[in-house]
């Protein structure tokens, strides 16, 4: 990626690059901690921002980028309302659905072990699901 973006003197570390989706796969997006801010940085919430462009890649390669980050190439897109409908019909309503959602966390987003991400997400989902069931039980 550094060679393709003509970034010189990268810091000696390996960075996993994720596939964000089939649209504009030549464009990179960096999800990162809010300790980094650039003109193209968009805050998502109090612990997560996104920045597009090569400037952040230059800073990451030079060791001056955000403390934690995740690089993705490309993105997915849905028609208006389509994603919401798919997620509403998701698990547990439809066990064959590919959608399970849970609250995002820095631990989940920035874990370096991709297999660990699944475990963290499913543990979080199960905890949230059980908590919701318990709240429902106590209010009925």
Which residues make up each language-model segment?
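A short aromatic-anchored loop/beta-hairpin motif
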Residues: 1-72, 76-140
């Amino acid at each position: 990626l550094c060679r393709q973006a003509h970034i010189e003197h990268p810091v000696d570390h390996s960075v996993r690059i994720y596939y964000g989706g089939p649209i504009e796969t030549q464009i990179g997006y960096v999800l990162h901690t809010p300790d980094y801010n650039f003109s193209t940085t968009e805050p998502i919430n109090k612990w997560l921002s996104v920045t597009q462009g090569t400037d952040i890649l230059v800073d990451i390669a030079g060791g001056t980028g955000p403390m934690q980050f995740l690089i993705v190439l490309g993105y997915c897109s849905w028609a208006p309302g389509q994603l919401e409908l798919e997620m509403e019909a998701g698990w547990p309503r439809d066990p064959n659905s590919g959608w399970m959602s849970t609250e995002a966390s820095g631990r989940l987003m920035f874990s370096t072990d991709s297999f660990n991400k699944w475990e963290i997400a499913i543990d979080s989902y199960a905890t949230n699901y059980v908590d919701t069931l318990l709240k429902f039980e106590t209010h009925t």
